[in-house]
Amino acid sequence: MHNAVLTDWIKARSQEAELVLSVCTGALLLAKTGLLDGLEATTHHGAIDLLRQTAPKATVHADRRFVDNGRVACSAGIAAGIDMSLHVVARLLGREVAERTARQMEYPWQP
């Protein structure tokens, strides 16, 4: 989070990206770049307070597995990243594809 080269790279790449996703404490990196300003966000439960400090202009949810703002989405912990990923698959390719993907992974997805 305190690596300016990394956060500058994330900010630059995000300007070209169709989607920007973070899993777990990756939300802190997005916060550091300002990408969460004015958006909803979440992160691992152990980093919620730090995310609130790092992204004071974001609405931080401690009770959500993931948050989808359209172009920017964040998940809570690592396993919640699977839920977010399947949500994005459903959004881009349809619910049936996401359900087949979850079955292939043997993951009990509950959209």
Task: Tell me the role of every PLM-derived stretch.
Residues 1-111:
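Active-site-adjacent pocket-lining segments in enzyme domains
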